[in-house]
Amino acid sequence: DMHVREEYEDMGKEALKVGLRIQELMGLNPDTEPVIDNMWANVSQFGAHNRNHTHPGSHFSFVYYLQSPEKCGSIWFSDPRAQAIAVQLPYNPKNPRKRETLNEVYWAPVPGRLIMFPSWAVHEVEPNLSELKGKKGLRVSVSGNLSFHLKKGVKYKEEREGHDAKGFLTMKGAEKRT
């Protein structure tokens, strides 16, 4: 319930600002707004890591780093398109490749950095190998999921018999079809 607690409101607002920017850049429906579905803390001691995973049920996910000692492990994203690596393009070895052409992208944890990504993106967090002892060696972050919901008072489609306000067929509508 971190996303509804007052002490985490500023962090939530930062994530919502990024969500609004994504909405603008991607040309999403202006009748929707970003909503934080949930938020949780990650306190990772030496050796702690997160295996590759996704966040089903949300549009975007985020991580906000609060503490990240040296060698505490990066977050990395892999290209979900299995065939993308079947035939590699001949990139110029004398020039660094652009980030968007890589099959894997790593982001170092930096305190104050918020990373937002599509919830379907496969990602993993490397083990915390910080040599600092005690609380100073912990990797501390807050993660969450964000979805776009219709703004209050906006109907997705005109309601019609057997359908809800979002235009989905209801049980009443299904009964009439049989």
Residue ranges: model-predicted function:
Residues 1-30, 49, 161-162, 168, ...:
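Non-heme Fe(II)/2-oxoglutarate
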Residues 28-39:
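A short coil-to-beta-strand element that immediately follows conserved catalytic motifs
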Residues 4-11, 55, 108, 135:
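Aromatic-acidic/polar surface patches that form glycan- and anion
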Residues 36, 137-141:
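Short edge beta-strand segments in beta-sheet-rich domains
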Residues 76, 141, 145-178:
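Double-stranded beta-helix
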Residues 49, 120-124, 131:
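Histidine-centered metal-chelating micro-motifs
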Residues 41-116, 126, 137-138, 149-160:
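Catalytic core of non-heme Fe(II) oxygenases with the double-stranded beta-helix
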